[in-house]
């Protein structure tokens, strides 16, 4: 029997998430208006965008889908605008809670579902970043996020 320390497995998962998040940046072009998604993998995308702005002179603006993403984007130096100011987005990069073989998705388990949907609908294109642990045969294997908006209660 071979025992692999849990820390080694976690390090591998984080490395793969980092690689996936950084690879998503290959779709970004100078001058784009970006939707900045929410989640542990997209976090690496946001950090890489900040690095490219600082080190390579990339010129983009972002619209965050959550307060956590807003805080991180500000920290790494991504200029932010509101969705209303954007006039529409070129690309949104976001994560997924699970996806099936047809690439149908369930999103929003991180608590930013409404904002994620609004930003996605405002974008011309979307890149979804997810690792293989999120792939399922049938959607619904994990918890299903449900929106409840306190409108007219």
PLM segments and residue spans:
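Short active-site oxyanion
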Residues: 31-34, 55-62, 104
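Conserved phosphate- and dinucleotide-binding cores of soluble alpha/beta proteins
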Residues: 2-18, 67-153
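Glycine-rich beta-strand-to-loop/alpha-helix junction loops that act as flexible
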Residues: 35-41
């Amino acid at each position: 029997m071979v025992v692999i320390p849990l820390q080694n497995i976690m390090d591998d998962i984080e490395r793969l998430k980092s690689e996936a998040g950084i690879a998503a940046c290959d779709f970004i072009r100078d001058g784009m208006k970006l939707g900045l998604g929410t989640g542990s993998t997209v976090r690496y995308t946001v950090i890489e965008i900040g690095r490219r702005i600082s080190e390579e002179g990339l010129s983009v603006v972002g619209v965050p889908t959550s307060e956590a993403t807003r805080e991180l984007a500000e920290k790494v130096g991504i200029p932010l605008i509101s969705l209303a100011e954007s006039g529409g987005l070129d690309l949104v990069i976001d994560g997924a809670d699970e996806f099936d073989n047809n690439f149908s998705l369930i999103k929003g388990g991180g608590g930013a579902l409404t904002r994620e949907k609004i930003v996605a609908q405002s974008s011309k294109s979307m890149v979804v970043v997810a690792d293989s642990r999120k792939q399922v045969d049938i959607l619904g294997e994990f918890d299903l996020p449900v929106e409840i908006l306190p409108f007219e209660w």
